[in-house]
Amino acid sequence: MRVSTEQFTELAGQGVEKARARPSLKMVPHFLYQKREAGLATLPDAAAAQACGAAIRSEALSRLPDLLEEFEKNAIANGAKVFWARTAEEASEYIVKLAKERGAKYVIKGKSMVTEEIGLNGCLSEHGIEPWEGDLGEFIIQMLRCPPFHIIAPAINIAVETIRDLFMARADMKEPTVDPVELGWAARLFLREKFHRAEFGVTGLNMAVAETGTIINLENEGNIRFAKSSPRTQVSVMTLEKVLPTMKDALHVMRLLSRNCSGQKISAYVSMDSGPKKDGEIDGPEELVIVIVDNGRSRIYQDPRAREALRCIRCAACLNICPVYRQIGGYAYGWVYSGPMGQVLMPLLLGLDKTQELYRACTLCGACKSVCPAGIDHPSLMLYYRSLDVSADIPAAHRFGGKKRPWKEALFFKAWSTAVERFWMWNSGISMVRPLMNRGSHRGVIRRMKGAFSGWFRKRDFPAMAKETFHERWEKIRNIW
Amino acid sequence: MKGRILLSARNEILERLKAAPKKEIPVRPFMPPLKEVALGRDELADRFAEMFTAETGIVYRAKNNDHALETLTGIVKREGLKSVMVSTDEVLAPLNLPAWGIKIDVKVMSPGDFKGRDDFKDAVFDGVGAGITGVDFAVAESGTLGLIHDRDQARLISLAPILHIAIVPVERIVPVYESVVASVFEKEPFPSQFVFITGPSMTGDIRGHLFKGMHGPRRVIVILVG
Amino acid sequence: MKEVSMFIPCTVDLFLPHIGEAMVSLLQRAGANPVYHRGQTCCGQPALNSGYRKEAKKAAKHFIELFGNDEAVVAPSGSCVGMVKHHYPELLGDEPDWFRRAAELAPRVYELSQYLVDVLRVSDVGAIFQGKVAYHESCHVLRGLGVSTQPKALISAVKGTKLVSMDQDDFCCGFGGEFANHHPDISEAMVQDKVRNYLDSGADLLILCEPGCLLNIGGYLSRHHPEKRVMHLASFLAQAGREER
């Protein structure tokens, strides 16, 4: 998948335009957000449940290396194979090699974010193995070659007419229709054939349980269950932070994930695999290969602050509540993970230099933090990344590749910080700036300004600087008060 | 050579993780239990039925196995089913579905009738109008079915056909997921797969429009026995 | 009489001094004695939010030097209060002596409505305003400080005022400091939605407790809906009080 995080501002502008043209787009996250509220209300103490989710994820990260070893040991004891990949390339190449060795003509995929992160589809195609996305939304955007608009509803923004044309051309649909149910039915028939004949299935996973060596997937469509039932070979890919200590923890995270994601008490299907099929079982994989992907995470893990971003369980509650995501949609974020989740993860995965706009395009409103079932403090992380741009000399900045700020900004804050601890300088600075600032003001309002602050004035006014600041007034009339 | 490369990636990753600064493990906050934990047997069955129906499932209640078979016959006739795929699990075994099929002239198949995976897949994907299974558990908390997949419970029976009919003895209804998982993972070997099924296969991926039967069953019918 | 030290945010000092004046009169009316340290400048938020921690630290130390001995510090801004309460201890975490001073100061810093209602136990300031009022839950007031009931109690106690509900009242207005200027496409769309919700609420007036939101929403209203008003809670209460007299 192409990375376009550096075009954030431009893409965000396009996103705003699209949402303006189609107000229904903004309703998607709002609808999911409302469902989430109702879903959480079914728990006796939602706040305690969320806090417990945060504690579980925090513990899982604290014990990460031990839990991974425990998981690996138990998964192998269950009969699974475990492959460790340092990078996206290592993971993709391994899966391609395995698919070739097994003689797979195509690969059926269950919906997963990690395989997008490692660019598996591209790698498979290059080697002449067709990847077929089993999830309806992923299937649509795969054929359209566009990024996911929303992590759990990747094609929710695509017009039915576009889908109709796509299915007529590419998915053997017989009669043109724009009815979502008939379109869904056409996709069912087409993908059913792929599920039926599949010899090689690839899925991601939501949780890996250290205690039992079990992997767990949540879904509503059944594409993942098919990918884990029909083929002879099942490859399940996980990033290394997916591991949880116990089955009990996994059940709690499952409750939270379903509710925070779609407001469901539990998603339609939850499948838990402990090894490949056993003798006498007629379906299920003959071999189960679990690929544990690092792709930069062990490096992120070195930094105790940045590490907190790895708590994420990909529920998308933060997207749905984010006022910025609601305006711009998923494309602007430029890679796999959109919304606040992406704003805290992608800078670490791709480097701060390629993602500076992402973590600066945030008002720090804290809505994401307030809904996160994993206890991620997104605003603090974004402030941290911003500081790494500025203090290029600290080791973390080197690790994540901070990108220098404009010299004018740096100079401004240098001057600012000199004045901020000297009030006389601060106040004389104000007196000096006032005539400049108020040059174009009219009746106490500034309506236009060129240069560095022009962005504000496109659609907004600003009050002129007061003839007397509060400070100056206080000096004069404090005796009256 | 190959082995060494694999091992080194593993060790490299783990060593890096182990070398990182340690952080404390937080204390877990107290959580009040779900209200289902306090329910009695009858209440559990009602709660299960209520929740399962809320997930657009359909519930029939039967007093005993004979009654369950009658109900099943009714469903099969109403749906106009010619052939069904059935599991051989311990819930279904006493119902003797093959004999029942002959009596009502419906072709009853089970995985044992097939030479292997491919033949079985052909039938379960394209040759049957419904899959019939027992369940190992049913969970009142969310109206959820729990199925342990093994040689008597093939995965595709509850997944590939457009209709899934599950026979649920009331004594298999438990309050919460924890009650299920504790027994499924009580001792090794663990089942190759364990699934929770809650309602039909569905999607909202096209403009948020709910579409049931995306890949799996469009409807799930439960016959609650006992 | 309870002495309380006022922190005047730089946005208020420079552009919205009437909010500071309103705060003075409100505090006095509520039976407190507001004092003002001449040496105050800025809490340091702009620097911290742009990543300039070293520079923000200077502001923090200056603030602590100035306000460190005060029994109570009150400011008409949730974000400035949040800066002092939450970010100062974090910023100064690597300097034990300063950290201790920051941590000791933190619980004594209040947002204005919080101070009036929770500390002075005053919710009726004796004001009158005939009309419908909507309240914007500013991010740093609501989620930053958990302050929401206090301003609503103060508004509801104003004679003749009806507090009406507003859709998405807890959604960010799109200010975010430099964000508003640097990402105008997004920020404008956000403030448009906020104003749309305000207009749809049928309120005559929008009240809030954060100068940043006031500049943003007010700036947009001034350009597009000059007949509609947005006010800081302090100004509203003080002005409504004057109308009464």
What are these regions (language model features)?
Chain B
Residues 2-226:
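The feature marks the mature, well-folded catalytic cores of soluble enzymes
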